[in-house]
From Swiss-Prot:
This is 3-isopropylmalate dehydratase large subunit. NCBIfam families: leuC (TIGR00170), PRK05478.1 (NF004016), PRK12466.1 (NF009116). One of its GO terms (molecular function) is 4 iron, 4 sulfur cluster binding. Heterodimer of LeuC and LeuD. Its cofactor is [4Fe-4S] cluster. Belongs to the aconitase/IPM isomerase family. LeuC type 1 subfamily. Catalyzes the isomerization between 2-isopropylmalate and 3-isopropylmalate, via the formation of 2-isopropylmaleate. Keywords: 4Fe-4S, Amino-acid biosynthesis, Branched-chain amino acid biosynthesis, Iron, Iron-sulfur, Leucine biosynthesis, Lyase, Metal-binding. Pathway: Amino-acid biosynthesis; L-leucine biosynthesis; L-leucine from 3-methyl-2-oxobutanoate: step 2/4. InterPro entries: 3-IsopropMal_deHydase_lsu (IPR004430), Acnase/IPM_dHydase_lsu_aba_1/3 (IPR015931), Acoase/IPM_deHydtase_lsu_aba (IPR001030), Aconitase_4Fe-4S_BS (IPR018136), Aconitase_4Fe-4S_dom (IPR036008), IPM_dehydratase_rel_enz (IPR050067), IPMI_cat (IPR033941). The gene is leuC. The keyword Magnesium does not apply.
Amino acid sequence: MAGTTQGAKTLYDKLWDDHLVSQRDDGSCLIYIDRHLLHEVTSPQAFEGLQLAGRQPWRLNANIATPDHNVPTSKKEREQGIAGIEDDTSRIQVQTLDDNCKTFNIVEFGINDIRQGIVHVVGPEQGLTLPGMTVVCGDSHTATHGAFGCLAHGIGTSEVEHVLATQCLIQKKSKNMLIRVDGQLGKGVTPKDVVLAIIGKIGTAGGTGYAIEFGGQVFRDMSIEGRMTVCNMAIEAGARVGMVAVDDKTIEYVQSRHYAPKGEQWDQAVAYWNTLHSDDDAVFDEVVVLNGAEIEPQVSWGTSPEMVIPVSQAVPTLEQAKDDVQRNDWTRAYQYMGLTAGQALADIQLDRVFIGSCTNSRIEDIRAAAEVVKGRKVASSIKQAMIVPGSGLVKQQAEQEGLDQVFLEAGFEWREPGCSMCLAMNSDKLQPGEHCASTSNRNFEGRQGNGGRTHLVSPAMAAAAAIAGHFVDVRSF
């Protein structure tokens, strides 16, 4: 087909070409979408647009929905279903999603369905995310699904309507970037630390205009859930798309999932999936290399994910800034975060700890936190420490393993699934001036609540901080 890549191809090239419907002279392309994930925040206007135009979804079984952003995570509110949501706006949005899914016959995992959860946890968990797919959602962290060798990215509300109506999107192809992490990670260093270190190196604009493929020995060794954590934060590195090549781990993870192909279709799918890797002689527009052995546990100190340092270091001084723009950004960050240049991370008094979000709420994350917490108690100075599983099924599995009791005995809150304190769109919020060790993906001003101060860390680092009351190096905890 005209417009497809000639010669050796990257994984991104292959996925793009396999879904290219047509291309115009200006470079704009029509791309077919295999899977569309919906939630309550970015879908209402899209459904309304369909109704006003008298249209129906083009391919019903390509769409699936679940409420996550606005749902409360306290047991009290959840027991009453949608009617129990105290915030009016949140209740209306969740109810509207429910109504729209019924009207258009779209499968929804509703608020009290055991399968409900954060959309980027639910998709892979159910086998809705499959290697080689194009996956979109009205959410910027859709790159999570790239961990399966997918072309996955977030879209806006008008594009949500367009996908519902046509199963296609107009896009322009990105350039190719390879981020290779060689060697092996040290003890206590996790996928979250890897992606934070990457962002610290290339900055939040480093991936702008690129589709990032993550490669190297560290990613070959990494679990699928770990790869999801890394791909999840491709957007924080400036890229809409992040992906990892398919391997045996990918196929093993997908096998027997509810929506995964079965029988002969499975065999055909696996044959295709095994081609989903960059050709040996494929050329990338940009290559970034890190040594995995040099990566330490990371802690963000400022108001951007790129303001991140190893736990062994202190808050940087203005003398370390590369230019006037960075000096100005750091000065503002010092003021907002209530920190001083050169301050030790251990001197930051924490108020709350949040372990959850589409970045770190899967069973491996909860196990890692529980391993640190077991037999210990949350520091008396911590106002709140909470564990929010990414889905009802993750919660169920953790409870079957007894992990909920580990946290409850330590003084953590064990919550219902949802986006929770990742963003200030539900009842889980920081108060002005509070510092939070968070396993989420963004530390912007006000992200977790007006005046709230967010520090991004791994689940293990967050758990250790909850016990100590401040940041500590989990490697020696």
